[in-house]
């Protein structure tokens, strides 16, 4: 795996590991960051497949392109787009799989992001998502600070019940939780010190302590069923 991709990864899971990606698939990675999941997906889809990485930060797109080159995959069908996740400008029914690794919780309009994922998927296409949710509510002022000082996979996280409601209201069915993990204090501290502080500064120690035992990483898949 290219070092640039590993150094810039803020992921909380490995969605390509449970997405059942097959040779020839078209995969779109929401919030591709430094490109780690794009590289992994490209190996799985093979020369006949296609991978598109979407990210809102031009700096990350450039680093993801570097990761693809370092992995020797520059001749594969890999594309990067600098755009918001809810405005990919990809055609309807474009992808077999949409992946995302601890990014959607950072988006202010999660409904629009999941609606966009649903739109670009083919019938029987699937999402494979790793993300962060809250197992307990936290104080509004603390939540607000997360959105401005904690990009380490936590800013914008919402209660788990609200998260599943968002996924289903976008049209997805057969939601299957692959894994759930309550983050330990050590993991929370690691997120606070994760790469990317040139974009967002880390939170205070007091804020980290305040959310201990309330933050969960989830991995799940869901299906876009064909119209009857």
Predicted regions and their residues:
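Conserved alpha-helix/loop element of class I SAM-dependent methyltransferases that forms part
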Residues: 1-26, 37-40, 44
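A short acidic, Gly/Pro-enriched loop at the edge of an enzyme's catalytic core
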Residues: 23, 75-76, 86-97
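Conserved SAM-binding loop
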Residues: 64-65
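C-terminal lobe and adjacent flexible extensions of AdoMet/dcAdoMet transferase-like proteins
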Residues: 170-228
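Conserved SAM/SAH-binding beta-strand->alpha-helix loop
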Residues: 57-59
């Amino acid at each position: 795996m290219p070092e640039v991709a590993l150094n810039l990864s803020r992921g909380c899971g490995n969605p390509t590991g449970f997405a059942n990606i097959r040779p020839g698939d078209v995969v779109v990675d929401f919030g591709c960051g430094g490109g780690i999941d794009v590289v992994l997906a490209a190996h799985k889809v093979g020369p006949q497949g296609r991978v598109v990485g979407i990210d809102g930060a031009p700096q990350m797109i450039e680093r993801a392109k570097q990761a693809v080159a370092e992995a020797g995959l520059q001749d594969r069908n890999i594309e990067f787009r600098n755009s918001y996740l809810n405005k990919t400008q990809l055609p309807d029914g474009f992808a077999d799989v949409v992946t995302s690794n601890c990014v959607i919780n950072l988006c202010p309009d999660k409904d629009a992001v999941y609606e966009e994922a649903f739109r670009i998927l083919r019938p029987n296409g699937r999402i494979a998502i790793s993300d962060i949710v809250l197992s307990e509510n936290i104080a509004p002022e603390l939540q607000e600070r997360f959105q401005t000082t904690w990009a380490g996979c936590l800013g914008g996280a919402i209660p788990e019940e609200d998260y599943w409601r968002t996924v289903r209201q976008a049209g997805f069915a057969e939601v299957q939780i692959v894994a759930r993990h309550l983050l330990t204090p050590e993991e929370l501290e690691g997120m606070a010190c994760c790469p990317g502080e040139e974009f967002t500064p880390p939170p205070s120690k007091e804020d980290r302590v305040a959310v201990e035992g309330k933050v969960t990483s989830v991995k799940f898949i869901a299906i876009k069923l064909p119209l009857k």
